[in-house]
Structures are given as C-alpha cells and as structure tokens.
Design a protein with these regions (language model features):
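NAD(P)H-binding glycine-rich loop region in Rossmannoid oxidoreductase-like domains
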Residues: 3-50, 58
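Conserved cofactor-binding/catalytic machinery of classical short-chain dehydrogenase/reductase
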Residues: 12, 26, 51-54, 66, ...
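Conserved catalytic-site region of short-chain dehydrogenase/reductase
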Residues: 36, 73-83, 130-136
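NAD(P)-dependent short-chain dehydrogenase/reductase
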Residues: 118-161
Length: 185
C-alpha cells in the first residue's frame, strides 16, 4: 500500500473532498489548532470542529476502513475530586470557562461520535502535552528548562500530562489494529 501527499486545509471542504477522492483505507486525522488565546477562538472552531466534521464525513462517504482521530486530554475535563486521576470516561466539565481549545476539542469529539453512530470505524486518542525530537513549540522547552533549574513554581494536583512523541506514535499505530471503534484512549 502506498500513500500520496496532498496539501490542503481541513476546514476547506473542497481540499478535503480532493484528498478523499483517492478513497483512503486508513486515515489519521491529526490536524488541530492549539492555542489558549481568545483571539484564536473563531479559527479554532473552523479547524478543530468544522475541519473534523469535513474529515469524518468524507471518510464515511469514501468508505475508509479505519480513522484514528487525534483529540486531546483537554477534551476530557477535570476530575471532581482534587488529586483524582481522570480516565477516558470522564464527562467534559470545562464548558463556560472560556477555554476555546478545550471546548473545540470536546466538540470535535462529539462530531466524531456522531459519525461513528452513522457507521464510521473511528478511534479517538487523547494525548497530553506532546514533546520530543523535532518539537518546535518553545513553551514546552521552557517548561523543562524551568523544571531543570528548580524554577517551576506550580504543578497542578495530579501532575502535568506530558506525552512523549514516541509513545503517541505507538498509540496511533496500536489504534489501527487494537482500538475499539467509538472509544477513546
């Protein structure tokens, strides 16, 4: 099996239709806009929610055999009891806090589940803050530098949810064969 590189934007339905004209059997939907700036809220809705809608609907129409949707730990919410560790069954409880990244990743999961109910074979992954070789996000490096100097002033109860890129890649590959459709991990 081969692959073809197609440049486009997930929020542009025409671009997504062009990509799915190739009838891909396996789809990794990893596109998303990570930001906690209020000024990015509208763009996040376009990319994270409408882009996900485009990909899921086109994957269903194309008859894709498996879709792996990269969501985020931010779509899970926060446990009701401080210090409790959340799992994939945690109900989203961050609505109304003005966190558009969290809200849009959760809404994207609702779009994914809607398409699962329509017959799409899709698995969701919820990694934490991804870091590793090739990481271009300076704020991740700043966190580690601060920790190494003893200068990280606050760590939330339950810790910081870091995910090594190698583990995230392994999870995506495992999701192809082992993930249960409609579930998140």
């Amino acid at each position: 099996a081969g692959h073809e590189h197609i440049v486009g934007a997930v929020e542009n339905r025409h671009d997504v239709e062009r990509a799915f004209a190739l009838k891909p059997q396996l789809v990794f939907h990893m596109a998303g806009l990570v930001s906690y700036r209020h000024s990015d809220a509208q763009r996040q809705r376009q990319v994270n929610v409408e882009g996900t809608r485009n990909v899921m609907e086109m994957a269903l129409a194309a008859g894709s055999e498996r879709v792996v949707h990269t969501s985020s730990i931010a779509a899970l919410g926060i446990p009701a009891v401080q210090g409790e560790i959340a799992d994939e069954g945690l109900a989203y409880n961050l609505a109304g806090l003005g966190l558009s990244y969290c809200d849009t990743k959760h809404e994207a999961e609702m779009v994914v589940l809607e398409n699962f109910r329509r017959g799409l074979n899709v698995v969701m992954l919820n990694p934490g803050i991804i870091f590793g070789d090739g990481d271009s996000h300076g704020h991740h490096h700043a966190i580690f530098r601060a920790m190494s100097r003893g200068g990280l002033l606050a760590v939330p109860s339950g810790g910081i949810p870091f995910s090594d890129i190698v583990d995230v890649v392994d999870a995506h590959l495992a999701a192809i064969e082992k993930g249960r459709a409609g579930e998140r991990y």
